[in-house]
Swiss-Prot record:
Protein name according to UniProt: 33 kDa chaperonin
Keywords: Chaperone, Cytoplasm, Disulfide bond, Redox-active center, Stress response, Zinc
Main location, first listed in the record: cytoplasm
Lineage: Bacteria, Pseudomonadati, Pseudomonadota, Alphaproteobacteria, Caulobacterales
SUPFAM superfamilies, per database record: Hsp33 domain, HSP33 redox switch-like
Keyword Transmembrane helix: no
PTM text: Under oxidizing conditions two disulfide bonds are formed involving the reactive cysteines. Under reducing conditions zinc is bound to the reactive cysteines and the protein is inactive.
An example molecular function term from Gene Ontology annotations: unfolded protein binding
The organism of origin for this protein: Caulobacter vibrioides (strain NA1000 / CB15N) (Caulobacter crescentus)
GO biological-process terms attached to the record: protein refolding
Length: 302
């Protein structure tokens, strides 16, 4: 652990854990540059949909980086609004992938008059879900809460309040920055939580109220500003109390799709179903929903 001081070094595609000195509050900060740009540009979604997926990626990294096992965290929301479904898959190696299903005309209609339509506007009524997948031989744990609040951050706070009973605050941001070589996507986020049972650091409620007041000063622009590093951001927020930077975890855009995985799926179809899938070139074309890669495969048994 190291004490934080302002610096000028900026590191993207990393999630960092931190601890407020002498207070029962900890947190994490995520900064996404090239990784989120790769995830979002693979799909070429309308801006409101890309913003929603970017927020979900930042949230998945914030929560998933705390897992103590090798596996995956799946963050998803599904509703009856213009965006039917958003899902992000985070694996504990730091890989991120995600996609959305939506109606383009409905997204365009609800976006009129909004600077940026939020999660509730885009998703409508539905549920917010987090799933912990510890591997093929382990049971999955899944928590489900209603979509409440206009932002995905509020959905996450509600999830932690109901499913984990852990006081939690989340702020997420997504935007585009001009790097001199055209606009690129960026995303960022910050999460703070009470450390349960940590009486040695003082009265929990007073500390939580104090840290929340500092947290509220976080600007969304700071979370995605390519010139503001994580140490600088934390120094701005918490330097009066003292803050320690703990471990950092690198992040990357990564999809687990492969010809072998698709082949396993194809083996589950009947010969008649496979025949209907064959294109004029004699191949079966399969597009991965996560990364948009197109596979052209020989029919099983060909």
């Amino acid at each position: 652990m190291t004490d934080i001081a302002p610096d000028t070094g900026v590191l993207d595609d990393v999630v960092s854990a931190f601890q407020i000195e002498n207070l029962p509050v900890r947190g994490r900060v995520v900064r996404l540059g090239a990784a989120i740009d790769e995830v979002l540009t693979r799909h070429d979604y309308p801006e409101p949909v890309a913003n929603l997926l970017g927020e979900a990626c930042a949230l998945a990294a914030l929560v998933g980086s705390s897992l103590k096992f090798e596996g995956r965290l799946i963050v998803q929301a599904q509703g009856d609004g213009p965006v039917r479904y958003v899902v992000v898959d985070y694996d504990t190696s730091g890989g991120l992938r995600g996609y959305c299903r939506f109606d383009p005309e409905e997204v365009a209609a609800v976006s009129e008059g909004f600077v940026r339509p939020g999660a509730k506007t885009l998703l409508g009524g539905g549920v917010f879900i987090m799933t912990l997948d510890q591997g093929p031989d382990m049971d999955r744990y899944q928590g489900v809460t209603p979509i409440e609040g206009e932002t995905l951050a509020l959905c996450a706070e509600q999830y932690f309040a109901q499913s984990e009973q852990t006081p939690t605050r989340v702020r997420l941001a997504v935007g585009q920055a001009d790097t001199g070589q055209g606009a690129t996507w960026r995303a960022g986020g910050i999460l703070i939580q009470v450390i349960a049972g940590d009486q040695a650091r003082g009265e929990t409620q007073d500390a939580w109220t104090h840290v929340q007041a500092l947290f509220e000063t976080t600007g969304e622009d700071e979370l995605i500003d390519p010139t503001v590093s994580t140490p600088t951001l934390l120094w701005r927020l918490f330097n009066e109390d003292g803050v320690r930077l703990l471990d950092e975890k690198p992040l990357k855009a990564f999809c687990r799709c492969s010809e072998d995985r698709i082949g396993v799926v194809m083996d589950s179809f009947s010969a008649e179903e496979v025949a209907e899938m064959v294109e004029p070139d004699g191949k079966i074309h399969v597009t991965c929903e996560y990364c948009s890669r197109i596979y052209k495969l020989d029919p099983p048994g060909a």
